[in-house]
Design a protein with these regions (language model features):
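Mixed-charge (Asp/Glu-Lys/Arg
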Residues: 1-138
Length: 138
């Protein structure tokens, strides 16, 4: 995931831990910086669609960050309906959902950053975090 964004010119921070003293308080899957946006990444590769846990984990991590920080959850086998409902009703709306098929499509087209911009635009204009990149020629 991170490498695809890096190839297209985004600055990335590879997975890291946040520590207080000697204790790890967070494990971050990565961060992306592009076009004035700062994004925290949570990536899951479960056999089944991801449930609410990755979303709630990322939401807790975002609560400790500047308000403009956006989160992105990548789930290679999609999301359960409860996960999508939760993400749609978060306040503030700051977590974008990426399904595996969308990521594969964006990588094949070398348009991962364009996909991010389409998802951000939809979230701002429509208020939903789960825009499907298969809906148009973004």
């Amino acid at each position: 995931v991170l490498r695809a964004f890096e190839i297209e010119g985004a600055r990335v921070r590879w997975p890291y831990e946040v520590r207080i003293g000697g204790d790890t308080i967070e494990q971050i899957d990565g961060a992306i910086y592009h076009n004035g946006h700062a994004l925290l990444i949570e990536a899951k590769h479960y056999r089944d669609p991801a449930n609410i846990e990755p979303i709630t984990k990322l939401r807790a991590q975002l609560a400790r960050r500047p308000p403009a920080t956006i989160g992105m959850v990548f789930s290679f086998n999609g999301f359960t309906e409860p996960a999508k409902i939760l993400a749609r009703h978060l306040n503030p709306q700051q977590i974008l959902l990426w399904e595996g098929a969308e990521l594969r499509l964006a990588i094949e087209k070398n348009r991962v950053v364009s996909g991010l911009e389409a998802k951000l635009r939809y979230a701002v204009e429509q208020g939903f975090p789960d825009y499907s990149l298969s809906l148009e020629a973004w």
